[in-house]
Amino acid sequence: VKIIKIFVIVFLSIVILAGAFLGVMTFLEYRPEDVTELPIENNQDQILSLNTELSIMIYNIGYAGLGEDEDFVMDGGKQGIPSSQDVVEDYFEGIKSTLLDYPSDFYLLQEVDLKARRSYHIDQVLGITSALGDDYSTQFAYNFKSPFVPFPVSLTEYIGYVESGIATYATYRVESSTRYQLPGAFAWPLRVANLKRAIMVSILDIQDSDNDLYIINLHLSAYDASGTLREQEMAFLKEYLIELEELGHYVVVGGDFNQTFPEAEGLYPVQEGLWEAYAIEDSFLPSGYRFEIDTTTPSCRLLNQPYDPSSELTQYYIIDGYIVSNNITVLSYDGIRDAGAMTLDLGFGDADHHPVVMKFLLNEGD
């Protein structure tokens, strides 16, 4: 009887503690508005012009914690966080060097930590702002904010506190920057410590034009087994793109779609048991737009193991790229290759994604 009583007390204590934890997490859950106007730090004075060459880079930097020596538990690896602050700092220095090595008018970055246990509380938004210097404005939108992420279940590897999101840096004057919450969410209680996906829309005036340039930074859902989140996010994006096309604006969407582009289907067959990126439907792209991707180089690797290009278990994807409106001309990036986006093959040294760069101009009279 005494043993049963002890068991009951222990069991009830666990239930009460778990309930209290979920209650606190639910109370503290990040609940963003559907539309949030964002501050533009250090906004620039330079105004866009038609028929002027512009450059852009998209780069999921993986919070400087997913470089060549790392794996990740959600991808079939073992780690929840990098092993030390030195590891993160080394990757972060490499990431900043890459940004400086490929100067761009616009940088659209994903998985940038403002403050998080997994990146040892390094303010990466500020670090990149400082590295780029005074010629860039900074815009940041949350898509992951939680006081405690209890995953993976481990005394040392748990993710813990997270403030993270997407960041856009620009050398031209940005008239407004807005965070749009994407539809769909995981069910409670998974929802309380999970990502709240969004797009960040930067609007820029253009000299001698009644239309504007819309730069859209995004990072769409990945671990969505049913595909329902993806469907809702893509439907939202499509509707927004149709609206902008009808108004005649110039549009560049860039980021990590976490989906395989139609032109890239079948290039990297997914091995059995590994994460598979949904394919973007052929019918998704609205009239007046086209994809701009590089099919010659993978943009992402799976984190089921540290990077080993000779291993049969190394899985690649092409899930990072652009959507561009037809009133924009895309140029050759290096003057050698054909016109189009170009993925920078950096050997996944500092992140599990490669940067994708592009040069373009806004057509006059469109």
Predicted features and spans:
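N-terminal, active-site-proximal structural segment of metallo-dependent hydrolase catalytic domains
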Residues: K2-A131, F140-L155, I159, E163, ...
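Metal-dependent phosphoester-hydrolase catalytic domains
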Residues: K5, F21-Q44, I242-V252, N258-D366
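A well-ordered secondary-structure block
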Residues: V35, S146-D212
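Active-site beta-strand/loop signature of hydrolases that rely on acidic residues for catalysis
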Residues: S55-I61, Y91-H121, Y169, S202-L204, ...
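Active-site environment of divalent metal-dependent phosphoester hydrolases
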Residues: A64-G65, L114-R117, S146-F148, A187, ...
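Surface-exposed cleft-lining segments at the edges of enzyme active sites
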Residues: K78-S84, V112-K115, L182-R191, H219-T228
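Conserved beta strand-loop-helix elements of the APE1-like EEP
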Residues: S130-G133, G160-S177, L204-D205, L313-V330, ...
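Conserved S-adenosyl-L-methionine
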Residues: S137-K145, S177-P183, Y333-R337
